[in-house]
Amino acid sequence: MFEINPVKNRIQDLSDRTAVLRGYLDYDAKKERLEEVNAELEQPDVWNEPERAQALGKERSSLEEIVTTIDQLDQGMDDVTGLLELAIEADDEETFNEAVAELDILDGKLGQLEFRRMFSGEYDSANCYLDLQAGSGGTEAQDWASMLLRMYLRWAEAKGFKTEIIEESDGDVAGLKSATIKIIGDYAFGWLRTETGVHRLVRKSPFDSGGRRHTSFSSAFVYPEVDDDIDIEINPADLRIDVYRASGAGGQHVNKTESAVRITHIPTNIVTQCQNDRSQHKNKDQAMKQLKAKLYEFEMQKKNADKQMLEDNKSDIGWGSQIRSYVLDDSRIKDLRTGVETRNTQAVLDGDLDKFIEASLKAGL
């Protein structure tokens, strides 16, 4: 005799998850809009305006992905329920297995739609930059910044992303004052965008001869790589461009010349820097690309009332804007936004971040 209840529970779970997505993705409004778009595309004169026709075609594809998938899920769950009833009546294991197989397919489709829900932002599919900045705590904070860099590099490697270290500024004694890395791969920004914020470390400091407990802070800021054709106006008069000798890993080849470049956008006080190439010209181009991306994110955050502005995220590297607390002596890491925590601190510092990231994405942060 086959197990009926687990399958019934799965059907209920799929039904509940589909209902949540139907509301979140505003299925009714999208279905109505899809009908309107289809009607417009059927008009004989639609291609008199090619750009509008292309935009409508793109909108239709996006709407169909949601509407069709939810329709298929609704119909599929009705079909599976019917197959399960037949299997029970006829005591037919083959029909039962067919119902389970259909359920697996539906689960996969729903998972793809849930993925879309998490990554629905305009630039979620883009590559991204990650800036790390040591804050309160001196050498301890600078060592913490280097630990965070290692953590994110390990995470990116495990996810199959490529990384480039754009800039590293060594700490006074150990660690890093700042670093910028580029993460390359599908949905890199989508995965990392909720990591922006202040990360707090509490531990017995290896730099304290008395072995006392120290609290230190470092900030992370994530922003997407933007297309070159995005129109972001930058007035050259608003820029201060400094050149300096590179430091940090990889800087040994360029230390003899001032090839590293730092660009400050004076109106916003946004700073970008690059030192990963021997050519000052190439470093300047890369720093300008980062500046363009940061300014774009700055404008997007200003427009979104539900997000903190860039100035808030960057200003107070201290208690005010923490997202996660890493208390190593107590073996406890806790996300202060979602409440997710773990005692496997070493795994997290080795890059096992998905538990935290997925919770923040599902919470819509």
Curated annotation (Swiss-Prot):
Q: Which GO terms describe its cellular component?
A: cytoplasm
Among its keywords, does the record have Cytoplasm? yes
List the top taxonomic levels of the source: Bacteria, Pseudomonadati, Pseudomonadota, Gammaproteobacteria, Enterobacterales
By what name is this protein known? Peptide chain release factor 2
Q: Cross-referenced SMART domains, in alphabetical order?
A: PCRF
Q: Is Cytoplasm included in the keywords of this UniProt record? A: yes
- Which family, according to the similarity comment? Belongs to the prokaryotic/mitochondrial release factor family.
Q: Which organism is it from?
A: Yersinia enterocolitica serotype O:8 / biotype 1B (strain NCTC 13174 / 8081)
* Any Pfam family hit: RF-1
Q: Give UniProt keywords alphabetically.
A: Cytoplasm, Methylation, Protein biosynthesis
In terms of domain of life, where is this protein from?
Answer: Bacteria
InterPro entries the record matches = PCRF, Pep_chain_release_fac_I, Pep_chain_release_fac_I_sf, PrfB
**What does the UniProt record tell us about how this protein is modified after translation?**
Methylated by PrmC. Methylation increases the termination efficiency of RF2.
Other noteworthy facts: The gene for this protein contains a UGA in-frame termination codon after Leu-25; a naturally occurring frameshift enables complete translation of RF-2. This provides a mechanism for the protein to regulate its own production.
Q: Which GO terms describe its molecular function?
A: translation release factor activity, codon specific
Q: Enumerate the subcellular locations listed in this protein's record, separating them with semicolons.
A: Cytoplasm
GO biological process terms on file: viral translational frameshifting
Modified residues annotated as N5-methylglutamine in this record: Q252
Q: What does this protein do?
A: Peptide chain release factor 2 directs the termination of translation in response to the peptide chain termination codons UGA and UAA.
Signal peptide (from-to): none
